[in-house]
Amino acid sequence: MVEQNLLNLTVLFDLSDRLEIVLTPSQMERDTAIVNYLVKQFQYECTKNKNLLQCKNAMRVLFYPTPQISDVANLANNLDIDLAKCQYAEKKRALVDMPQNFKESLAAIYDKTLQQKQWVGSDIWGFFSNNKVDQYCIKQDYRNVVVILTDGFLYDKYNKQNQNGNEYSYLLPQTLNVE
């Protein structure tokens, strides 16, 4: 039985060329606005019953696959809050610091990704078909919510699936070459 007051919120980010400023100049602002809204909702859910001491909610930001840029992986650690693992004073501090930590860490992640121009993308197909969603996003007895920020492409260079010669997990210009 899911307790309605336990929230496990996961945001899956697509670090693809959708972040390229030339292609989509306002993408960072839009993503940041969405995450800021989710952070405010998370804070509200944690404090609405005035029982922060008992609150065990969790929120995290994921990148799948994990970027090879070590700074991004380190910054992502700032985007993981699990109040079940915190004492009361830590919970209060985590909630107070959360908006600024998320804002600064996301800005730094975007900056590092844009500097490196290593568009790892997001293997959404693999994330769901290989049960990574269960591993990373599902907590028993929680209301589990997964928000995906992507341009919708399922393509990942490490997960190219071609079944029966005409069913693909991706679509590239080369795929359409008909002879």
Which residue ranges define each predicted feature?
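VWA/integrin I-like adhesion module and closely mimicked acidic/polar interface patches used
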Residues: 153-179
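Surface-exposed acidic, glycine-flexible loop patches that form ligand/cofactor-binding
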Residues: 1-3, 48-53, 132-140
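Short, surface-exposed linear patches
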Residues: 32-35, 82-85, 168-172
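Ser/Thr/Pro-rich, low-complexity mucin-like regions
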Residues: 139-147, 156
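N-terminal post-signal-peptidase region of extra-cytosolic proteins
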Residues: 37-47, 127-132, 169-178
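Catalytic metal-binding/acid-base residues of hydrolase active sites
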Residues: 16, 152-153
